[in-house]
Every structure is written in C-alpha cells, then in structure tokens.
Swiss-Prot record:
It holds the Pfam family DEAD. Keywords: ATP-binding, Helicase, Hydrolase, Isomerase, Nucleotide-binding, Repeat. It comes from Saccharomyces cerevisiae (strain ATCC 204508 / S288c). InterPro entries: DEAD/DEAH_box_helicase_dom, Helicase_ATP-bd, Helicase_C-like, P-loop_NTPase, Sir1_ORC-binding, Y'_ATP-dependent_helicase. Catalyzes DNA unwinding and is involved in telomerase-independent telomere maintenance. Residues 900-1051 form the Helicase C-terminal domain. Induction: Induced in absence of telomerase TLC1. The keyword GTP-binding does not apply. PANTHER family: PTHR31583, PTHR31583:SF2. This is Y' element ATP-dependent helicase YIL177C. Belongs to the helicase family. Yeast subtelomeric Y' repeat subfamily. Residues 668-845 form the Helicase ATP-binding domain. The lineage of its organism: Eukaryota, Fungi, Dikarya, Ascomycota, Saccharomycotina.
C-alpha cells in the first residue's frame, strides 16, 4: 500500500483495518465513507465458495458455475502480503439512536430491525425509538392488515371478472387499442399474495403522521409562510380520527355485494400489487441492475443487499414478474430518482433508492400547491390539475383530452422551424406513464427533496411569477417553482434532462413493452381511492357524492351512467356549490392523511368540549410528548331483550330457556358486574348456551367491539366447539393460534383454543399489549377484551400429568378481560377452588352464590385476579342426581372387547342411524379395536399420540359425517363432545374414576345406554399421586351423590336413578331401546350364537405388531387353506364331510353344534367303530337302504362314511366307487324308491324333515329329548351294538331314526368334538385314507359342496376351529359377523382359493423362509461364500423412499390383509427377501446404472412379491454375474489371496504411500487421528471431502446414540444424501449403520486394537490413542462415499475393484495388506494414508491426471 493511501486510511479512522485484513474473506466490509470518497475505487466480481462459505474474488481460473453466481461490488483493492489482495467495500453502520435503542416490551430489537428492513424495505431511512414502536405494531397485527388487504382485493377481482360485458367494466378494463379485456384470471393464492404485499403500505398510510421522517416535510409554496409541523400534529391529534374500522366496513360491504366500487378499486390495488412488487436481491425474476455509470449518475447504484433500482427486464421472459418498463417510464423514474445529498433522512452515499421510498410514500404524500384556502387532493386530481405542468419550456404545456383521455402536449416549436402552435396527443401507453409520473412520482420527489432544495439557478427560459422583485428570488424558490412546473429534471445537476440521455434510453430499452394500466384505469383507480379514503358519507350523502364526480372533472350524470359508481338524483351541480363541497371533501382527505399544514378544518367547531380542551392543552406546550386524545365512548346499555334476540337468532323464533335457572344465570353472565363466575351444571344441561347467547348479544353491539376467548382441555373438543359456535353465522369464530401468530384481525368475535394456548408465552404477551395495540393500531378504545371462558376447568386440578403445562397461565393478565367464566360439569367446590388457585386466581368466595342471589359486587376496583370467584352450583340447587336419563349398566365379563362387539352389533341392528363411543384405557387398545372392528362398522379412532390437526380432522369427520358409526378413543373423547345421534357409550377401563364416568355418561344428551365393562378376576391399578381413586363396586348413583355432596336416599324412593335395573327416570325412547336390546340378547342366547371378537391375550397384545400370521395343522400339507376356519375343517374331516353336515342343519344349529360338543363322546365313538364294524355296516346295508339313505343324506354323507373307514376299507370302497358306481348309486335311487319314501312321509312330514331346524320343530324336539337320554344312548353304543343296529336298519327304520334325531341330538353329538376329538379322528385316518379321500373328491363335488354351503354355514365352521389352530392365527381372521351377506360368499371363497394357490406357489419357490433364509441362498451360493457375501446391515431403510415401504398393508408381503400370501411360521418375510434382492442388484451396478434400474422397476415399488417373481426369472444370470464380478473379493476376504502393494505398478509409480514401510503407514495413520482428536474435527465429514469442521460432541460421546445425534444436528447425514450416492437409499440408512448392524465387525476391531497396543509396547513406542469404534466406523463410511478417493484407490491398488455395498466395503477394509517391507498392515490404514496424500492444494489437477491415466491404461490393456 502506498504511503499516501495509508495516511488516508489513518485519517479515515479505520481502526479495524488490521483485523479486517487478516480475515479469510477476500471481501472486507468497511464503514468509512471518507475512505471511499478519497481513494479511487474499482468494480470487481465476487462469489461465495460452497465448501468453505467464504467470499472470494472472481479470477481467471474461477469455474463457470461460480462466475454465474457472482455479484459485483464497488471496492478498494489493498495488497496485504506477497501476491495477496483484499478488497474493501462500503457498508454503513447501524442507525444511531439518541440515547441508544430501547428494546420493545414485546419484541426484541433484532426482530424489530428485521421486520423494518424486510417488510418496509427502508434501508436508507433512519428511525428513532418512537418510530420503531410504531412500526412494531404492524408486526403485532400483521394478520389484520393481511386479511384486510386480501379480502378487498379478492372482492374487487371477483366483481371485475363477473362483469366483463358491463359498460363500465368494458370502459375500465378494456384496452383502447386491441379491445381485449385485461382482467387476468388469478387464483385465490395469487390474490392473497398480492393482498399481503399491499398490507405494509396500508399500515404506513394509517400511521404516516406518526413517523419522524416526515418532520422534515414542509408543504408551503415559495414566498409563503412555513408551517410548523409540530403544531400541525397538535392540531390534528385532538380531532376525531377516521377509524380503521371503516376499512373493515368496506370489506363487509364487498362481501355482502353492497358495493359498486369494486371494479374501480381493483385497478388501484392491482397497481400496488403488480407495479410495486420489486423486492430485494433474491426475489422472483430479479435480473442484474442496469445503470449509467457517468460521473454523476442519473440512476443511483445500489449494492446487492439493497433494493434494486429501475428494473429493466426483457419482455421475452414469461417467468419474470410483469414489470417490464419502456423508455418513457424508465426516463420518468430516473428523473425523479436523483435527490440532493444533503438530506438527513437519506443515505449519504447512494442518495435514495427509487424503489425504497416508492413503497413507503405511495399513499402518504399530500402537497399544498395553490393558495392557502384552496386544497388539492393528491392522488385524486381533477383533469385540469396538470394543465400548467410544462413539458420542456414555457410554451410546452401538458393537457388532457376529455374525449380520448390521452395526454396532450401544446407547443409552438416544430422541426420545420415554424412557430405554429400545435396540440400533440400522446399514445395510450405514454399517456399512462406521464399521468402516473405527474400525479404520483413527482409528488414523492418533491416531498423527498424538501424545502431546503436549491440546486436550480434562475435561467431566462424560466417563468417566475408571484414575486414582486424577480431579482430577489433565491435558488430555493426557483427550485421549488421548477419542481412544480417542469417534467424532465435532473435534480442532481440542477438542469433539465439532456436530449442525449433521452435518446440513450430509447436505444437501450425495448419499445414493445406490454400495456398494463391505461389512462382510464389509473385515473379511475385514483378517484376510487379518494372516495374510499375521504369518508364513509360519500356513499350516503348526496352532495358529497356529487362532489366526488366534480373532482373527477365530469358531471354527476356521467358518473352515474358511464361509470356506474354512485346513485344520484341530481343531474347537475352549480359551480359555486361544487367549489364549496370540494373544499369540504378536500379538508377531510387532507386531515385523514395528516400531511398538510396550516389549515383550519371548516367543521372543527363540531368537536366536543373534551377534544377542544385537549387540543388547547396540547398546543400550550408543543415541546412535551404528544399524546393522542380520543373521545371515550360510553359502553352501550344492555338489556334482557338482547339475550332473547340472540336466542332467536341461534335457535329460531320458538326459542325458550330450559328452565328458570338457565335464564337467570345467562342474565347474570351478560349483565352483572361480577368479574369472575364459576358454573357447575350437569353434563347435557346446556352450559355452552350460558356464554354463547351473551357473546352473540355482545357482537350485535355496534359501537363497542368485544373480542372474547374460549379454551377447552383437548384438541378433540376444539373442533366440536368451533362447529357449534360458528353455526348460523352469528359469531365470527377463529382458532386462538391465528391470534397468537398474527394478532387481532379486526373481524373475529371469538377465538377458540386449548389449554396449551392459554399457557403459552405468546398469548400472554398479546394480552398484555392489548391496550397499546388497540389505541395505536385501531386509533380507538372501543375494541375491548370481552369474556375469558374456560370450559371443563376442573382439569386444572384433576389432570395431574398435565399440571406442569399449566404453569404459564399464572402469568396471564386476567384483569384485562371484562369477565372470566369457568364452566364444568364435574367441579364441586373443593375441586373448583383448588383449580382456580392453581392458575393464579384467588379461588372461590367463601359462600357459594345461590342462583337466586343476583347481587352486584360492592367493590370491583381490585381487579378480576384479586377478586374471589362466585360459584353457581346448579346441581345442588336442583338437588337432582345428574345423568338419570341414561341407563347405566356395570358388567364383569371374560372379554371386554368381545362383549362390546356384541353390544354394538345389537345397537346398530336395532338403530342403524345411531352412533356410539367406546372408551379404551390405552392407546394400543384403541388401535387394536379400530383394526378389528373396521369390518363391521365405520370407525374413527383418536388418542393422544396423534397430531393436533389430525385429531381435529377426525373429530369433525365423526361429528359431521352421518355414516361414521363408532368413535374409539381414550378418555379425551368423553369431555364436551355434543353429538345428537349418540345412543351408546361403552367404557373398557378398570381405572375409571368418578369424573371420567360422569363425563363419559354425559355425552348421551337425550338418553341412551352406558356400559361399564371390566374383566372378571381383575383389580384396579393403583392411581397416581393426586389422582382421584377408581370407582368402587356397588351402586353408581350413590357414588355420584357422594361426589356432588347431595343427600343420600338409601332406603327411599329414588335411590337408584338410571342404574341397578331402575328405569323410572328414563325416557320412553331409552326404555324401548333397552327392550329391543334385551330381545336381541334373548334371541342370541336361544340360538347359542357365539361371536369371537378377540383372542384371550388381547389386552397384552402389542399394537405395533401388524404382521399377518397364517396357521394350518400341517405346514407341509398341500391342502393348507388360508385362515383358521378352513384349517379346522381339514383337521377334523375333509371339506366334503363338513359340507354334508351343513346340508342337514341350518346356520343357527351348526353354530350351537360346534359350541356344545364334548371330546369324550366322539372319541369313544371313533374308538368303538373299527374297520370290521364299518365293513359290516357297508355290507349289511341293502340297496333299498342305501337308496333311502341317499335320499335323505346327500353324496356328502357317503363321503363322510368313506372318511370313517380304515385304510383297507377305504381303498376297497373307493375302488368300487368309480364313475360308474356313482352313476349306479344315483340310479338306485329311482323314481319308485323316491316315491315310496315320499308316500311313507306325508307332505307335513316331509316339510318337517326338510325344515328340521326350523324354530317350532326345533323347540318341540328339544323339549322331548333330554340330555340324560342322549348320554345313555352314547354309553350303550358298543361296537357290537352298532353292528346289529346297522344290520337291522331298513328304509323305514332309517326314516324314523332321522325323524327322532332332532336338532338338539345333533347338537349334542357335534358339540362333543373338541380339539382332542379332532386329533383322535385324524389319528384313525391314515395317509392312505387321506389320499383316497382326496382322490374321491372331484372338482364337481367340491363345487356342489360350495353351492350348498351358505356364508353363515362357512362362518359357523370357522367358529368350531380347534383352539390349537387358532393360537397362531391373527385375531382379525377369527372375527365374523352373524349376518354376513350370503351373495358375497362365493366371491370370498374364490378369493381364498386364489390366495391359497398363490401362497402354495410362493412357498414352493421359497421353501426355506421358515428358517433364517437370505437371498444368496435362493440364488444358490454355498455357505462359505454366503459367509463373506452376507448382506448384514441391509434392512428396509436400504430401500429408497416409496420402495417396499407402503403403510396400512401387510408388513410381510405389502398386500391387503385379505390377499396376504404369508403363511404361518414364516420367519423371513417376502419383503425382506425383496430388499435383499434389491441389494444384490446394487452389488452389480454403479450409481448411474442403479438409478436407472430403480426407475425400471417402478411398477414393483409397492409389490415386493411381484418383484421377487421378476427377480427369480434371471436368478441364474445374477448368480453368474456375482461369481464373475466378486471373485477377487471372495479370494481376498477368504484369505486365499493377499494384497501386496509391490504388485501394483500404478501404485508404486503414482503414490509414495506404496513405497512406505508398514511402520511408516501406521505412524501416519496414528498421526492423522491425533490431529483429528486435538482439533475435535468431525470425522465423517473430514474423510468425505477433507472438510475440517469441529464437532466436540462426537469426541466426548461414549455411546453411539450421542454421536448420531451430534452428526444429525450438524447436518452431516443430510449433506451426505445430497452430495453422494447415499441419496439412493432410504433417509435413515447411513444413520442406522451406527447401531447394532456391524456388531461382529465391531468385536473384530476391538480385538485388533489390543493387538496394535501390544505391538507398540513391544517396539518400545509410546502407545498411541487409536480411535474408538464409532469414530472408526465414521471414517470408513466417509471413505466409502468419497468418490474421488475411491477412484484413486482403485486405480492405485490393482488387486481390488469396485464394491457398491457398505457391508462389503467394511469387510474389505479389515483385510491385511503387505507393505513395501513385507510387514502386514490393515487395509484401512493404507486407505487413510492415501486419503491424507490427496489432501493437498493441487488435488483437483492430480485427480484429473489420475483419471486420464486410468482410462488410457485401460485402452492400452484392451
């Protein structure tokens, strides 16, 4: 650095010079403006390095991507060393506040600064402390302004789009040239975005008079007296402010379609949203700034951190925002962008950036342009308001053509030299921009330059008027006149814009920029804005409406007929009247803006006395702090009629209160001054209406707005409350979360939230700042906090596990609310008092308040929090036991879910449109019940582990969707939910306390049934400390009385209310429902129907285990049938035998049959029936008998006879029963035999035989057959007896026997077949018998059997399955519905056969899945090969997202549960084999090929079974390819070959590591780890890309979990996935490698550590600290994914090739290598040495050469 430059540095007092030059960045920030003014600068490009994050200068060798991302800076270059340069760039200091910045009470300064710079884009403006407090109000109330802007813009767009053919719309929204409409079709999200962009400007519009930056604003013309702006503010403050509420009214009118200004207002809002959308760097579509680099530039330059100036975009980029500017507009913008450098409010370096203060001052500027008493409305000028603005010289004036609405230039200068005056009309686009410049930009430019601007001197071409002596006119006066008279000015030079500059823009800028807003649109938009902002009386006041049209420079009739804006009755207004009315309108407009000075409002006399006194007091001492004095509006009177009107709005004209208590309490809440009220009313009483009606009454008050809050304990109740309270549109209801995040929106009447919201710090801060927000933001004190309502407040005391979450409620300012209301149905005095004290209140008053004692409080000055809460106990007052309208039954059952399923089935059979709630004790039980019952009902389930949004969605679905039948959940579903169709509540909880019982029963509003089911021989678990004890055995009513403190009525009438069988207090509908349920229960008992709901181990089952298991008696049997039902059929008899049984008995009989059989009877029967007996039976049955038997028993019976015969008998029988025999058998039952049989059996008898299982016959038969007789018959039936009976049985005897064997006899016989019986039957049927049986069961027989077996019969067969077959089955497979549709059975059974066939094929293809099979076995590898190729560490996370990871399906095969192909006893699932097969494919492919492979198998991403079939087709090819590609790997890992570095020619030539001894390699390895340990470097990141980032937690951790958390916190895994091939696996794959996947390798590594330690001690070397296992694994993983290192290692070490799986890499790294001195070192040490060698400055070039050599060597080899 030169000596002169160094002195300048010292003069600039750049104290941080030395430290800044030592910075690693090439770009150094410098805050000294003097330095940059005195030392020459240059423009250089810089970019941010992705690896290091440093800012570096663009050099010759910089890559193309870095050049593309570069940015330019004006810098000073400094040499800080040999060939080392640093570059200084100017960055100004933070604004300096007087006395230092004071943090806001509710926002930290950092948030304020971020909000100001981000939202308002005012980097160059300086604010004081008061300004920050004002601007912070927008942050606190952003939601209000966002919603307001969005609603207005949405409505405007709706109107404009809906009226395309309207005359006013056509004129307003149609292009003058093309005639095409310009109203774009915008999506709602786009409109919302535009509306949100407009919100900051609307806020500044309302608070512009409160910002200090406008203190420099002076609004006087030259020669007039200057006005004191402080006095102006004091004059404005006492006046009645125009409230923000007016804007809300605009929104409401638009929503109700009362407005007629929507189309006009749309234009101006669209102009704000589209034309002022230019944002800071990084916005959508930003391009590089284009500026003219002159000595004094017209367009000031702005760095990349500021806003872009004068965006010049190409019209050929459709993705850019529509902001293309043509030459004229660019000229207008640039001409007013230059401002003087001496203004305090702007930046000293760059002047002011145009787009910064356009956003701030768009709505705020109002200028006084003529005489003192004549006012001009800025932004709403009349057409002749611009007629005096000169274009270039005094003879070039600007006019507006009233017909075409185009700008006209009047001039007497022509290029031909003539002085003939001409009027030149501009085109529409140019007219738009000129008008925009005159009415908007020039006004803001004047405001920004201020009264001290004096750059212009007096020239002859200037007309100086209004001064007695022109020679005494100062430069300041001249400059003022020029600004108001001429268009194209260069304010920096103090002259007009040169013609060369104008031509330059014409050459550079596009000439075909698309038209945005034409003149008519802009003009009418400005007029519409003026109408809305001046006052609401424009809509109703006749004269002022007419004045608005005069201000637009057309008649009233024109405004009505052409524009369709207002409705008038006058056709004209005289000029004098129009002038007066315009003055009044202008005064209101200017007063509202608060920017003009020295005027006296003509209606100031209308102010009240309070305002005048306040104004005088403020003006007497203008140096004191100005406080806004607002007129305090009295609270509107309340009456009892308000509540009645509210009830009629909500419930209709027939509204009446439930009783007198409800009426009086509702009046107490609405009208009394009691600050805090607690109410205990029974569930279902209507507690919600106690505050709902007062809220509606408050919302109807027009003068005062009340904002109330309701809090409920659970998210489930939140959804229900919002639905109930928002009905009929009486209240605007919103979630509290909206208020916490965005503030009050000005519309909502009631916010609803949960207890967690009430306890949050953000909510507490919002309430604490309420008064300040309302006064400053809404400029009124008439928006008040209404009621704070807490429902079910007893939870504050009873919810022990949540009490720590309620601590934040004590910080809430309860005194800010008008009234606090606490409601509960289960809060006696003791519970209520403790709950209130827990949240910081005083508690209950000593004496609970009676409902009739409506006394006012004597002294409420202490506030709500210090005043005791008055308790209204409606339960004690009525002296009635609650919930008497509900029938409550308590049962002890064997299985709670089984009993609950029976009750629900019975309920929906009798009441199909009803709903039910089931309360479970655990979340696991909830999920199990939902999964099990989904086939019977439409189920919704909820528990606490679900997210808040999901809870709300599911609750809303159950409440609103009539098809949903059952809601299953934990106790959170029992509080506060109101469902009219609810008729049953079932509680499956052994720890139920009295509050939970009352809340659950209370859901039954209009009566119903409540069942409390508990298991037999169970005991209630111990309750936690502080919790209520579980309910006791005995009468429920008595326990409820005791809880509420009511008088006991033991021994009196009314002791049992809805319990213990009492039905006295129940409604008629409830009694009828009970009777129907009882009849269904009796019918089920008579039929002895058993419904198996869940296995006995249901309570202990784990809900997370969703695998489907399939069972059969013999795994190797080819007849393995899906499900326990078919399996049990195979266990006892073949399918055909079961079919014959089903033919003779109906569904009900079979069901009871299977339930009542005992084992010993069947066992003795089977034992006494030997082969000889059966043979005798078959031989002694003559043809006639056989025929008669065939008549009554189908061919199925014959099949059953074959089953019972021994092996020899069966073979002979089967051999003689061929196709011909079957035909002869059928023929022996000829017509004669049939007829004789029929003749012996009368019509009535036949009917009884055919319908032997009908109700009447069965009952009479049952009564005549006793159990004792049946038992004695079974006892006396020996082998001999059976033989004689069979031989003497003729046709007639058979008939009588059949007629005497009633349903009960069949049941007793069948009922004795249990598991033992089935086993004995199977034992007597040997292999030969089974084969012959199978051979005799033809396809035709099976079909006929299927047709004869109804759906119910099959289900009854399923129910009789032996217990052994069920023990491994899934509970869902054993469920059945007793009324299943018969027509669906054929489809189900066909589906079962298809699934059975598929399962058989898969089991045959993968026979070893019952063992620890892997895919390598399937491919045919030997065990020793599998040992080294084994895929440990490969799990489901190896698969990419979406591959074999579908949820809600079977985890074993990824199919629907009904189509699951898994089988019982399967240890290795098909999905596991599929992801192992995917890993095998990865073994054979590099990254690019594997990525393509994943795309090719996309059809199989959700079907692992299908993928296995696809994989199996090429198994031989895959096996050969693995053998070929991994032969070297197997040779090395099996120690058959040894790697020697001396055998690698390329390694010896290209790396010094290959010439090192083993000891040198080890020393280098330990040195690397020592350096890493000292610097606490992140291991995985270092070995991945040599990045030395610190991670102290990784080195201090002692377990894998902490290391993984540290790496995850640092984003290592995320970077690994984004930068390497790890992205081809699941997101958790690499992270899970640190778990127990590699425990075998870990043990080997730990053994090797001991060996290394012994070696070092033996060599006399100080033992080095070797890395622990986690760091070692991180190293290997980092090296595996380091592509550059892998390529070099594979190039240098010729004995190895590529491996693509991490497990193989880990095994390979542990093999031993012979170093140059023939000593053995692990390969991973050699790897680290090579990695270290690569870590040098010339790595990129070296890598490139290595790859070239590698490729060339391969070519030579080939």
């Amino acid at each position: 650095m030169k000596v002169s430059d160094r002195r300048k540095f010292e003069k600039a007092n750049f104290d941080e010079f030395e430290s800044a030059l030592n910075n690693k960045n090439d770009l150094v920030h410098c805050p000294s403006i003097t330095l940059f003014e005195s030392i020459p600068t240059e423009v250089r490009s810089f970019y941010e390095d992705e690896k290091s994050g440093l800012i570096k200068v663009v050099k010759f060798r910089t890559g193309a991507m870095d050049r593309k991302r570069s940015f330019e800076k004006v810098v000073i270059s400094v040499m800080v060393g040999k060939n080392v340069k640093k570059f200084l760039t100017f960055v100004e200091d933070e604004p300096d506040f007087q006395g230092g910045p004071i943090p806001s009470k509710y926002l930290i300064p950092k948030k304020i600064n971020l909000m100001v710079y981000t939202l308002f884009q005012v980097h160059t403006l300086k604010f004081n402390r008061k300004d920050y407090d004002t601007l912070s109000l927008f942050y606190l109330n952003r939601g209000y302004y966002n919603e307001l802007s969005f609603r207005v813009l949405e409505r405007c767009h709706e109107i404009a789009s809906a009226r395309p053919n309207d005359s006013s719309t056509m004129r307003t929204f149609t292009d003058f040239v093309s005639g095409a409409p310009i109203v774009r079709s915008l999506q709602k999200s786009t409109i919302r975005k535009y509306g949100y962009n407009l919100a900051p400007y609307m806020f500044l519009l309302l608070h512009v008079d409160e910002l200090s930056i406008f203190s420099a604003y002076q609004a006087s013309l030259p020669g007039e007296k200057k006005v004191d702006t402080e006095r102006l503010k004091r004059d404005l403050c006492p006046r009645k402010p125009i409230e923000i509420k007016y804007f809300s009214q605009i929104c409401n009118d638009m929503m109700n379609k009362k407005d007629r200004l929507g189309d006009i207002l749309h234009i101006i809002l669209r102009a704000c949203a589209l034309n002022f959308g230019a944002g800071p760097r990084g916005g959508a579509g930003d391009e590089e700034d284009r500026s003219i680099t002159n000595e004094e530039p017209i367009i000031p330059s702005v760095d990349e951190h500021g806003l872009k100036v004068c965006k010049l975009r190409s019209p050929n980029t459709p993705r850019r925002l529509r902001k293309t500017l043509d030459a004229v507009k660019a000229l207008l913008v640039s001409s007013c962008a230059c401002t003087a450098r001496d203004l305090d409010i702007f930046d000293d370096n760059n002047g002011v950036a145009m787009w910064k203060w356009i956003k701030i001052l768009y709505h705020e500027v109002a200028q006084e342009t003529t005489l003192k008493d004549s006012y001009r409305i800025t932004l709403v000028p009349s057409s002749d308001g611009i007629s005096l603005l000169a274009f270039a010289g005094p003879q070039r004036n600007v006019y507006v053509d009233d017909t075409t609405r185009r700008i006209q230039l009047y001039t007497d200068y022509n290029k031909n030299g003539s002085s003939e005056p001409r009027l030149k009309t501009l085109d529409g686009l140019t007219s738009d921009y000129v008008f925009y410049f005159v009415t908007v930009l020039r006004q803001m430019q004047i405001c920004a330059l201020g009264n001290s601007y004096d750059a212009f001197n007096h020239d002859p071409w200037m007309d100086v008027v209004g001064f007695e002596d022109p020679n005494q006119v100062t430069n300041r006066d001249i400059s003022r006149i020029v600004l108001y008279s001429y268009m194209f000015l260069n304010t920096a030079k103090g002259c007009l814009v040169e013609y060369a500059t104008f031509r330059q823009y014409m050459r550079e800028l596009p000439k075909n920029a698309p038209q945005k807003l034409n003149f008519r649109e802009m003009r009418q938009g400005l007029i519409a804005l003026g109408r809305h902002c001046v006052g609401s009386r424009f809509e109703t006041d006749l004269y002022e409406s007419a004045t608005s049209e005069l201000m637009a420079n057309h008649s009233v009739q024109t405004g009505r007929n052409i524009y369709g804006v207002d409705s008038f009755s006058l056709t004209s207004v005289s000029g004098t009247t129009a002038t007066l009315l315009q003055e009044r309108a202008s005064e209101r407009w200017i007063q509202w803006l608060g920017l003009e000075s020295d005027y006296h409002c003509s209606f100031s006399s209308t102010r009240n006395a309070e305002d005048v006194v306040a104004g005088e007091a403020a003006s007497s001492n203008h140096h004191q702090k100005i406080s806004r004095v607002t007129r305090k509006r009295p609270r509107e009177p309340k009456s009892t009629n308000d509540i009645l009107v509210a009830g009629q709005k909500l419930f209709g004209s027939s509204f009446e209160f439930r009783d007198l208590h409800q009426l009086r309490l509702c009046y107490e809440i609405y009208m009394a001054d009691t600050p805090s009220v607690a109410v205990q009313a029974p569930p279902g009483y209507g507690k919600t209406e106690l505050f709902h009606l007062p809220l509606i009454a408050l919302a109807s008050k027009g003068d005062v707005e009340y904002v109330s809050f309701l809090f409920v304990p659970y998210t489930v109740l939140l959804a229900n409350c919002m639905i109930r309270l928002g009905r009929c549109g009486c209240l605007n209801v919103a979630p509290v979360r909206n208020f916490i995040e965005e503030g009050y929106d000005g519309v909502t009447d009631l916010y609803v939230g949960i207890y967690d919201d009430l306890a949050s710090t953000n909510f507490t801060d919002r309430i604490a700042a309420w008064e300040n927000i309302v006064e400053c933001t809404f400029r009124t004190n008439n928006v008040k906090l209404g009621y704070l309502i807490v429902d079910e407040f007893h939870n504050f005391e009873t919810e022990v596990y949540r009490q720590s979450q309620f601590g934040g409620i004590t910080n809430l300012d309860f005194d800010a609310f008008e009234k606090a209301i606490f409601l509960s149905g289960t809060a006696p005095e003791a519970v209520a008092d403790a709950a209130l004290q827990r949240i910081g209140l005083t508690g209950l008053a000593k004496k609970s308040m009676d409902i009739n004692e409506l006394k006012r409080s004597e002294d409420l000055s202490r506030g709500l929090s210090s005043y005791p809460t008055r308790m209204f106990n409606l339960i004690k007052e009525k002296s009635e036991v609650p919930l008497g309208h509900v029938h409550k039954i308590r049962k002890k059952v064997e299985s709670q879910p089984e009993e609950a399923l029976k009750l629900l089935l019975a309920l929906f059979e009798s009441e199909p449109e009803s709903k039910a709630i089931v309360v479970a004790s655990t979340t696991n039980e909830v999920e199990e019940l939902a999964c099990s019952w989904r086939k019977y009902f439409r189920v919704v389930w909820i528990h606490g582990k679900l997210g808040a949004a999901e809870k709300v969605s599911r609750t809303k679905e159950f409440v609103t969707d009539g098809s949903m039948q059952v809601l299953i959940g934990t106790k959170l579903v029992t509080e506060g939910i109101d469902i009219k169709q609810l008729m049953m509540v079932i509680m499956l909880d052994n720890r139920l306390n009295i509050i939970e019982l009352i809340q659950g029963v209370g859901r039954l509003r209009d009566g119903g049934l409540c069942y409390l089911l508990s298991r037999k021989n169970s005991w209630a678990a111990r309750n936690r400390k502080g919790e209520l004890p579980p309910i006791k055995e005995g009468c429920i009513t008595e326990q409820v009385r005791e809880f509420y403190g009511l008088e006991s009525k033991k021994g009196k009438k009314g002791q049992h209310v809805g319990c213990c069988g009492s039905r006295t207090d129940l409604s008629a509908d409830t009694v009828e429902l009970i009777e129907r349920m009882d009849r269904l229960a009796e019918k089920q008992a008579t039929a002895s129907m058993s419904i198996v709901a869940l296995p006995s181990s249901f309570q202990e089952s784990n809900s997370s285990d969703r695998y489907r298991k399939y069972c059969s008696s013999d795994e190797d049997s080819n007849t393995c049938i899906h499900g326990s039902a078919n399996a049990s059929t195979n266990a006892s008899t073949n399918a055909i035998t079961t079919a014959s049984t089903n033919v003779r008995t109906n569904a009900t009989t079979n069901a009871s049959t299977n339930a009542t059989t005992n084992a010993s009877t069947n066992a003795s029967t089977n034992a006494t029936t030997n082969a000889s007996t059966n043979a005798t039976t078959n031989s002694s049955t003559n043809a006639t008998t056989t025929a008669s038997t065939n008549v009554r028993t189908s061919a199925t019976t014959t099949a059953s006879i074959n089953v019972r015969t021994s092996a020899t008998t069966t073979e002979s029988t089967n051999s003689s029963t061929n196709a011909t025999t079957t035909e002869s058998t059928n023929s022996s039952t000829n017509a004669t035999t049939t007829e004789s049989t029929n003749s012996n059996t009368s019509a009535t008898t036949t009917a009884s035989i055919n319908v032997r299982t009908s109700a009447t016959t069965t009952e009479s038969t049952n009564s005549s057959t006793s159990a004792t007789t049946t038992a004695s018959i079974n006892v006396r039936t020996s082998a001999t007896t059976t033989k004689s009976i069979n031989s003497s049985t003729n046709a007639t005897t058979t008939e009588s026997t059949n007629s005497n064997t009633n349903a009960t006899t069949t049941e007793s016989t069948n009922s004795s077949t249990n598991a033992t019986t089935t086993e004995s039957t199977n034992s007597s049927t040997n292999a030969t018998t089974t084969e012959s049986t199978n051979s005799n069961t033809s396809a035709a027989t099976t079909e006929s059997t299927n047709s004869n077996t109804s759906a119910t019969t099959t289900e009854s067969t399923n129910a009789s399955a032996k217990e052994d077959a069920n023990k491994d089955g899934n509970a869902e497979d054993n469920r059945f519905h007793p009324v299943t549709d018969i027509n669906k059975e054929s489809y189900k059974r066909k589906g079962s056969q298809m699934v059975l066939l598929e399962r058989k094929k898969l089991k045959a293809q993968f026979p070893n899945t019952s063992e620890n099979m892997n895919v390598l076995q399937f491919l045919g590898f030997r065990s020793d090969e599998i040992k080294h190729l084994f895929l440990y560490g490969i799990d489901i996370y190896f698969c990419p997202e979406g591959v074999f990871t579908q949820y809600g399906l079977c985890k074993g095969c990824q199919k629907m549960f009904e189509l699951c192909v898994c089988w019982a006893g399967q240890k290795v699932s098909y999905r596991r084999i599929a992801w192992e097969a995917l890993a095998v494919e990865r073994m054979l492919r590099n990254d690019e090929e594997y990525k393509e492979y994943l795309e090719d198998i996309e059809p199989y991403h959700g079907d692992p079974v299908g993928y296995l079939k696809y994989f199996s087709v090429k198994r031989r090819e895959i096996y050969s390819q693995i053998q070929r590609n991994y032969a070297w790997y197997l040779a090395i890992t099996r120690r058959r070959e040894t790697i020697s570095v001396l055998d690698s020619t390329r390694g010896k030539q290209g790396s010094q590591v290959f010439r090192m001894s083993g000891r040198q390699i080890k020393e280098l390895y330990f040195k690397v780890w020592s350096n890493l340990r000292e610097s606490k470097t992140e291991v995985l990141q270092y070995f991945l890309n040599w990045d030395e980032k610190k991670c102290q937690e990784e080195w201090e951790a002692k377990d894998d979990t902490v290391v993984v958390e540290a790496l995850e916190k640092g984003g290592v895994f995320q970077r690994l996935r984004s930068m390497t091939s790890a992205g081809l696996q699941g997101p958790q794959y690499v992270k899970l490698q640190f778990s127990r996947h590699h425990r075998q390798l870990r043990s080997r590594y730990e053994l090797s550590l001991g060996m290394h330690l012994r070696d070092q001690i033996a060599l006399g070397v100080t033992p080095s600290k070797v890395p622990h296992w986690t760091a070692f694994l991180s190293m290997l993983i980092g090296l595996f994914y380091n592509k550059t290192f892998r390529q070099k290692l594979e190039y240098l070490l010729e004995q190895i090739s590529e491996v693509w799986l991490l497990p193989h890499w880990l095994d390979l790294a542990n093999v031993e290598v012979l170093a140059a001195d023939d000593t053995r070192v692990p390969l991973y040490m050699l790897m680290v040495a090579v990695h270290k060698e690569l870590d040098s400055d010339d790595v990129p070039d070296g890598r490139f050469d290595i790859l070239l050599c590698r490729d060339s060597s391969r070519e030579v080899g080939e």
